[in-house]
Amino acid sequence: MNTSCLVTGGSGFIGQHLLANLSRHGYSPVVLMRRISEFPMLCQRVTELGGNARMLSAVQGDLSQPGLGLDTAAQRQVAACATLFHLGVQFAWGLSLAQARTVNVEGALRVARLALRNDARLLMVGGYMLCNAQHLARVGVRARQPELTDWPAVYRRVGGYEGSKLEAHYRVHAEMSLGGGALTVVHPATLCGHTQTGHMLPGQPFAELARQLSERRLRAIPGSSQHWLPLISVDFLVELIRLAAFDPQMIGQSLLALDARTPNLHGLVQALAQVLQVRPPQRHVPMAVLKALLALPGLPNLLQVEPESLDFIQRERFDLSQTNAFLQRHKRDWPAIEQAIGASARYLKATFYAAS
């Protein structure tokens, strides 16, 4: 069996845990890195996460460059990879259409073309919003005929980051279908930390919610008692990604990685506040009111809330029958999401918010 695989976005939160998981299970990940000088530091992080850094290697490349910026030697090394994991994105709020498309859309297409050229299987990480048909219709995505979607209008409605993730999904599907490639997509919910250690990186939406609570900036809970922020622990997500990538039955399929037992947003805030030892808000602010306030100049900075982030807070529930069948086939059970939430809050408090 060919154990070599290419990983984009390996330096990110999911990427670090995926490299640890793959290397721990005998795979040999090749990491695409813009700054290859940071590879030793990445190896150290992978070791700390329980991986085998000796299984890792790196090639210099860039998602924003033609041909991924690979030189001849790197192309030969990548050509030996039977599986490509595409996690690399530019994540930031307030991205322009051009900024978001450069890496998140064009970069994804470059990875897809590399997979087709090398006859490699592609595992792409999408997002759970792509599994919400009502949301897609609301923001103007023509899911059945995506080529007819007015993408600039979608970007204006949901922001550059989410717009580019949506567009990349449909563009890559079309590219792989046209070329007869093997594609599997995993759609993760919002990430919380490792189930046991709580490890996570700052800047994640879950971590930002904890930060707002820790700094006592969260005065009211967005939405209503029906709203929730669907979660998945990072360790279980990367386990699902690895299993899906090497499952022949998952070629041409997608997998929703979302824990339906995630508490509603009120319950999540209460659980975080208990660990952080702060008084949680009890009142709700209607989503429409909050979005209207955030449309006022200067309010997002004052409240430290990004308007784009509100779309991830949902009322809709999701069909997990395919996911549960996948787990049953692989003899896996959902880990306790309450444990992951508590461990994540403790890790964030000890690592980043101790002085708050």
Residue map of PLM features:
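N-terminal Rossmann NAD(P)H-binding glycine-rich loop of SDR-like oxidoreductase domains
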Residues: 5-27
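NAD(P)H-binding glycine-rich loop region in Rossmannoid oxidoreductase-like domains
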Residues: 51-56, 60-106, 114
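A conserved pocket-lining segment of Rossmann-fold NAD(P)-dependent short-chain dehydrogenase/reductase
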Residues: 152-156, 208-236, 240-244
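Active-site Tyr-X1-5-Lys
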Residues: 154-184
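Glycine/proline-rich active-site loop of Rossmann-fold NAD(P)-dependent oxidoreductases
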Residues: 179, 194-207, 244-255
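Terminal hydrophobic/aromatic helix or amphipathic segment near a protein terminus
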Residues: 265-317, 334-338, 353-356
